[in-house]
Amino acid sequence: MYDLVVRGGRVIDPESGHDAVADVAIRAGTIEAIDRQLGAAKEEIDAKGLVVAPGFIDLHAHGQSIPADRMQAFDGVTTALELEIGVLPVARWYDEQAEAGRVLNYGASTGWAFARIATMTSQQTESSVEGMGRAMRDKRWVEEAATPAETAEIVERVRVGLEQGGIGIGFPNAYAPGAGVKELSELCSLAAEVGAPTYTHIAYMSNVDPKSSIDAYTRLIGLAGSTGAHMHICHFNSTSLLDVDRAAELVRTAQRQGLKVTVEAYPYGTGSTVVGATFFADPAFPERFGTGYDAIELVAERHRFGSRDELLAAQADDPSALVLIHFLDVAMNEGHRSLLDTSVMFPGGAIASDAIPWTLADGTTYRGTAWPLPDDAVSHPRSSGTFTKYLREWVRERQTCSLIDGLAKCTLIPARILEPSTPAMLKKGRLGPGADADIVVFDYEALTDRADFHAMNRASEGVRHLLVGGERVIEHGGLVLDARPGRPVRRSYR
């Protein structure tokens, strides 16, 4: 007898191409069979009229907490990974997650930025986007090239993180643009040596030279070619700014030449980061981004800056404060809409949210267990609705691709980006015998994102059931409050 059978749904598996009504049988957290009219089970889910698909894999999730997991569960996510910034020490982070309990599967890369902070400053900081922001009070790790001795120490710290199971190397290069190419090349060679990807926020975000986005993309592709490293580009849509078409051309050419370069994007024209990011302080920021300072909005206060002086004061006060950056007007500008389409629909590219932590009105990060989230909890709509927005808008409404191809960008493609280095991903992102029972069951016609920039903490609708390792996280559209089935995703480690 099976533990659970999901009966009579439209089962879609992007790997095999299966798209037909069938049952999915689960035993001990693993899919055992997919066929019509499978046998008896201890429990059943009636999926008639619903889509049954692999759970979504998010390569870029900064929340890494119970409230963040819960919001992403309603977005169809079953695996949420912190790969762009990463963590350090890696082993300690995984131990902390296991002790706290997680709703979704979790994992992280080895955090190069935290290796720089530990080596080049006297600061002790937590492995989080907020911790990185607080460390920006000491500009040395941000603005200066490491000495040869420091480079050796940074490389060694990262090597230890990889040995502890870090899923590659996180390179938020834009937050430490002073890092030298010698340092970066050594780390990329290390990644190639151990067969692990790198995940890069490119060094520069600018529509104009010098230090343009295209400059940074050219350097990234050069590192892929010269070191053999797999260079994964984080949030392709935002770092390219208005030059996404040229950036896409460069990436396609690199891929045709056999270089290991992959991309991800999220379906919004507004980004988010910490206010202390050095690119905001650049006197040429308006020219480089093509926006004014009023495009930068403090998340907690919902306040837009009026001048560079006001921005600099905020950076001095709390560099870790989260902000929104409104860089594309996709609602009113058809040219901007086309740019976003180029990145979101890039062939072979993954959908990834760049979900950020939930912040309360007093500026603190919310890590509690209240459900629904507190009324004053804010983040970015992408933290709630990235995958449902993509499937609703790009797939169902605009029909830019078929449903099975749209689902592949949320499931199989991110799994394949990771699986050469992380064998656990061979069992995720697909539905078939032997695969992990990470499954989303949704009403395709009702699937929709509800979060916007006026109400960011509204959960998406349309996910009727969500299973993580065969355990229910969402049941009949409601959250299972005590569910903590999340398991670590980790490279082999000592």
Regions picked out by a protein language model, each given a short descriptive name:
Residues 9, 29, 49, 60, ...:
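Divalent metal-coordination and catalytic microenvironments
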Residues 64-70, 150-159, 216:
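Short, acidic/polar
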Residues 11-23, 330-334, 397-408, 416-457:
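Acidic, glycine-enriched loop/beta-strand segments at the rims
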Residues 1-54, 449:
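Histidine-rich, glycine-flanked metal-binding segment
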Residues 341-349, 354-374, 439-485:
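C-terminal cap of metal-dependent C-N hydrolases
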Residues 116-177, 221-225, 230, 234-403:
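Active-site neighborhoods of metal-dependent hydrolases
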Residues 38-42, 46-101:
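Metal-associated gating/positioning segment near the N- to mid-region
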Residues 70-91, 103-114, 162-176, 195-206, ...:
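Divalent metal-dependent hydrolysis catalytic cores, especially in the metallo-beta-lactamase
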